[in-house]
A protein has these predicted regions:
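A short His-aromatic
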Residues: 361-363
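Class I SAM-dependent methyltransferase Rossmann-like catalytic core
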Residues: 120, 124-186, 193-200, 205-264
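Short amphipathic alpha-helix with an adjacent loop that forms part of the alpha/beta core around
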Residues: 336-348
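Local beta-strand N-terminus motif with an aromatic residue
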Residues: 268, 350-351
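A conserved beta-strand element that flanks and buttresses the S-adenosyl-L-methionine
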Residues: 355
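Class I (Rossmann-like) S-adenosyl-L-methionine-dependent methyltransferase catalytic domain
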Residues: 4-97, 108-109, 140-144, 212, ...
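A short glycine-rich, Lys/Arg-flanked "PGG" loop and its adjoining helix->strand segment in the class I
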Residues: 369-381
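Conserved class I S-adenosyl-L-methionine
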Residues: 265-279
């Protein structure tokens, strides 16, 4: 990865999110300077997202969300004051690893949803529930990733701008419900997954049907002008799209380099995405690589959500990539947080790339290190691990769990913490190269074995 070693990366600094959040910008640049003084390799990503062509809109959305966040705090304070016992329990439970949601937290959140709905979607068009109901699910990233290509609708249902996709689900349509996972119908495997997690059959059926109904609404829901502005220009959306672009760029460069250096066919290479969600990012990488070279590696898509994997299969078929994916629906972590043993998935195969860039920010430090060690065991010599984390010093950090209301809780970390956790997992500092996205929201770590 010689491209990271140039002198330019020693001196460059960032104006993250165009320098709008001055405090975050200063803290991130200080972090980067300090790490480089310790001979850590840190690169700043380029501003390639189309949103950067409209800096005034980025500034406007930043200010708009700051105002909304302040108003939401006042609403929340009032709710907590009236429900002190409920709030205290919710605050304790949300700090416990792998507790995704709880009744008390949901009660408070339901009060706030009315405000979020009006503020994010538009006060005259309060129908963002189809998207908000998918929070915590990888399906929401379909909306964010494809924001530039979504049609936008006005108050009376008229089309303000016609995009490639008519609804907030982007490339995903109702064909997803026809997918089978491991030969079983989607509904059946969703029910079985819940039963395996201790839910009784009647409740499992009810929850699966409710989830499918919610996804169906999501697939049919339009995008309003206000919501479009937010998902195109807010820091979090920029960060997600930049993370995808960074990961895919690293992956494509690595596979091409290995093909040339080792005289191997890219078709024979193996990539794994651990916690892949809908697989949209990985499928985009496959499509781009195949368009450029005529070849693409086999990708193992590993996730515990059957519906997300069904979405991945459906998207792969649309892009004629179904013969390049291998889907595994497995529980990723035990109840105590131990990562899935990859031997059952990989057997004696070795990986050219192990990627989990959207997962680590949900993991406690101990589980983070266990996952690193488990993935390293199955990487080829000269293989590449790609991971990442949301930055603690990122711009507009309170938006994610505030106005957006994202669940579960994200563990934002400093860039230095990322380096330390990887080093404590047995990776030499010299093997780690970090890219901080231009928005300052994420850091992507590339580790070559």
């Amino acid at each position: 990865m010689e491209k990271f070693r140039g002198e330019q990366y020693i001196t460059e600094t960032g104006d993250f999110l165009n320098g709008i959040d001055h405090e975050a910008n200063e803290k991130l640049n200080r972090e980067i300077v300090d790490l480089r003084s310790e001979e850590c390799r840190v690169k700043i990503g380029e501003k390639t997202d189309p949103a950067y062509n409209n800096p005034d809109k980025i500034q406007y959305i930043y200010n708009y969300l700051e105002q909304g966040g302040a108003e939401l705090k006042d609403v929340r304070k009032d709710i907590i004051h009236k429900n002190l016992a409920t709030a205290a329990i919710a605050n304790v439970l949300e700090k416990i690893p792998f507790v995704r949601e709880n009744k008390w937290g949901n009660d408070i959140d339901s009060y706030l949803e009315i405000f979020r709905d009006k503020f994010l979607y538009g006060k005259d068009q309060t129908d963002s529930q189809p998207w908000h109901n998918q929070r915590g699910s990888a399906l929401t990233f379909l909306t964010i990733s494809e924001a530039e290509d979504l049609s936008v609708f006005g108050k009376n249902g008229e089309i303000l701008s016609e995009g490639k996709y008519p609804t907030m689900s982007g490339p995903l349509d109702e064909s997803v419900f026809d997918e089978k996972i491991n030969g079983l119908p989607l509904t059946e495997i969703m029910i079985q997954e819940k039963i395996n997690n201790g839910v009784d059959k009647a409740t499992a059926i009810e929850e699966a049907e409710k989830r499918i109904s919610g996804v169906r609404e999501f697939i049919q829901a339009p995008v309003t002008e206000k919501f479009s502005d937010v998902i195109r220009h807010c820091a979090d959306s920029l960060g997600i799209r930049e993370r995808v672009e960074t990961v895919n760029g690293l992956s494509i460069d690595h596979l091409k380099r290995v093909a040339e250096k080792e005289n191997r066919s890219i078709d024979d290479m193996l990539v794994m995405s651990f916690g892949c969600g809908t697989g949209l990012a990985t499928l985009k990488m496959l499509k781009k690589l195949k368009d450029e070279t005529g070849e693409a590696p086999t990708v193992i898509l590993l996730d515990q959500d059957p519906l997300s994997l069904a979405a991945a299969q459906s998207l792969a078929k649309k892009w004629n990539l179904e013969d390049k994916i291998e889907v595994h629906c497995e529980r990723l972590f035990s109840k105590l947080g131990k990562p899935l043993s990859l031997e059952g998935v990989l057997g004696n195969r070795k990986l050219d790339i192990a990627e989990d860039s959207g997962l680590r920010e949900y993991l406690p430090d101990g589980v983070y290190k266990q996952l690193t060690r488990e993935s390293l065991k199955f990487l080829r010599t000269g293989g590449l691990m790609i991971t990442g984390n949301m930055n603690v010093n990122r711009p507009q950090k309170e938006f994610l769990h505030g106005l957006m209301g994202w669940v579960p809780k994200v563990r934002m970390r400093s860039i230095k913490e990322g380096f330390k956790l990887l080093q404590k997992s047995g990776i030499p500092k010299e093997s780690i190269e970090a890219t901080v996205t231009a928005s300052g929201v994420y850091t992507v770590f590339a580790i070559e074995t």
